[in-house]
Amino acid sequence: MNLKEAEEKMQKAIEATKNSFNTVRTGRANASLLDRVMVEYYGSPTQLKSMANIGIPDASTITIQPYDKTSLGLIEKAINMSDVGLTPNNDGSIIRLNIPALTAERRQEMVKKTAKLAEEGKVSIRNIRRDAVDSIRKQEKNSDISKDESRDLQDKVQKKTDKYIAKIDELLAAKEKDMTTV
């Protein structure tokens, strides 16, 4: 693994962390809250967003209008079974999800969940660093590169690691600020 590959993988880890942050409730309506909701549709799990139009009419409401009206009950069941923590209101053609204001206790739970997701992102980046350093050491052992080049490359990998971990910390701080602001 070279430095460029390691950096690309670290960038992907950042994107994955951002996406996982988007699934955490902040007290505002956001279509990405439903990204992980899978609906059992004709025997196979299907992403909700691929079988319905998801709208945000106001800051505290999400509307779900399925392309196939017969799937309303299945969507409602999938939302109830998911860990979204919202109760669907089915009016026969549209499902509405009202987003209640988060209590201080619930906000703290969400902050902890976000911190855990950030830590998973950091671990992922550290694993990429470990793989890159192992690859560099292997090249040094095989005499493909000198000891000085090896040390230089390992330092560069560490600097990239520090940069991307700092980026995750920035994302976490911004998300926590978003969640704790009422």
From Swiss-Prot:
A Gene Ontology BP annotation from the UniProt entry: translational termination
* Cytoplasm in keyword set: yes
Q: Name one GO molecular function term.
A: ribosomal large subunit binding
Q: Which UniProt keywords apply?
A: Cytoplasm, Protein biosynthesis
- Assigned protein family: Belongs to the RRF family.
- Give the originating organism: Trichodesmium erythraeum (strain IMS101)
**Name this protein carries in UniProt:** Ribosome-recycling factor
Name of the gene encoding the protein in the UniProt record: frr
Residues of the region (Disordered) are 136-156
GO CC list = cytoplasm
Subcellular locations according to the entry:
Cytoplasm
